[in-house]
């Protein structure tokens, strides 16, 4: 493997074929998880360190379950109580973990680009579990897997992503994956939460930008709502939550305009009653709980790949 190929920092470094191979492996891993004994010895003897510098529920637990299902030794690292609180640098922490025998590090960090720094100083494999606004590749992979398992393919799907586009690491990773696999993507939201269109089209020229959701719904195969980060209200990027919900909130009335085969997704955590309503989040066509379930199989597939 080349230096970057040893790591999964974002999907920009994965070809369409490689992404498809991960999704295919995830299908096999889902079969493992359906058994009475949900474990295979694929990573026996390997040590996976989950190093989370940000709070997480779904991603952290999903990675722990995935690694254990592959029979890996799993170590949960938290910054609280560690030498990081005493001033140890991120690089020194990683070198310590390497000296202790870590084979794979799964890292979440608040600073965009932190995984690139770690990757330069770690001889094993690094999986990015989310860094700042930059990337969340395993969320994108599980989203792709969910779309494919529900709709049969990714190519030519029209995927509408609505919400706080500008500040979302999920969007960026999904754009790499969706465009590589031939989907059509529309980013939708208030202009202040999308930013300049050229910011997106310079990297993904095939992506469309829209500021109204309703006209997109009759032709959408997938609608993915993003969490509205309430702190944006304080910075003046939104006039009022009620106004946002009126124009962009996923209500049962609004989703009645979708084609019968369409699905609704959300990477979580959700602000119910703001970007999505409870009756929508827990009933068809929503597949939000399915996304969470699929995350274990997808992360098993990626860990298996990273272990060589």
Swiss-Prot record:
Gene3D superfamilies reported for this sequence: Aspartate/ornithine carbamoyltransferase (3.40.50.1370)
MF-aspect GO terms: amino acid binding; aspartate carbamoyltransferase activity
GO cellular component, as recorded: cytosol
Binding site for carbamoyl phosphate: 58-59, 108, 136, 139, 268-269
Residues where L-aspartate binds: 86, 169, 227
Keywords: Pyrimidine biosynthesis, Transferase
Function: Catalyzes the condensation of carbamoyl phosphate and aspartate to form carbamoyl aspartate and inorganic phosphate, the committed step in the de novo pyrimidine nucleotide biosynthesis pathway.
Name of this protein: Aspartate carbamoyltransferase catalytic subunit
């Amino acid at each position: 493997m080349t230096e970057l190929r040893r790591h999964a920092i974002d999907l920009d470094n994965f070809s369409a074929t490689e992404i498809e191979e991960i999704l295919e492996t995830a299908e096999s891993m889902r079969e493992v998880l359906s058994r009475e004994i949900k474990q295979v010895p694929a990573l026996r003897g390997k040590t996976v360190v989950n190093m989370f510098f940000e709070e997480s529920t779904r991603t952290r637990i999903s990675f722990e379950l995935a690694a254990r299902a592959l029979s890996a030794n799993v170590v949960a690292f938290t910054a609280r109580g560690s030498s990081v609180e005493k001033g140890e640098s991120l690089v020194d922490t990683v070198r310590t973990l390497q000296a202790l025998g870590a084979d794979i590090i799964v890292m979440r960090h608040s600073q965009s680009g932190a995984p690139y720094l770690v990757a330069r100083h770690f001889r094993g494999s690094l999986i990015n579990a989310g860094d700042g606004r930059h990337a969340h590749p395993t969320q994108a992979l599980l989203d792709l897997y969910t779309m494919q398992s529900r709709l049969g393919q990714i190519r030519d799907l029209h995927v509408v992503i609505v919400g706080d586009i500008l500040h979302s690491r999920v969007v960026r990773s999904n754009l790499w994956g969706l465009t590589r696999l031939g989907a059509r993507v529309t980013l939708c939201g208030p202009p202040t939460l999308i930013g300049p269109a050229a910011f997106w089209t310079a990297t993904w020229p095939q992506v469309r930008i829209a500021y109204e959701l309703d006209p997109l719904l009759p032709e959408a195969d997938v609608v993915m709502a993003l969490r509205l980060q309430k702190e944006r209200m304080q910075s003046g990027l939104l006039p009022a939550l009620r106004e946002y919900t009126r124009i962009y909130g996923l209500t049962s009335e609004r989703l009645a305009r979708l084609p019968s085969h369409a699905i609704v997704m959300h990477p979580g955590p959700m602000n119910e009653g703001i970007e999505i309503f409870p009756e929508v989040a827990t009933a068809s066509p929503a597949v939000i709980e399915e996304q969470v379930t699929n995350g274990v199989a997808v992360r098993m597939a990626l860990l298996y790949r990273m272990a060589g």
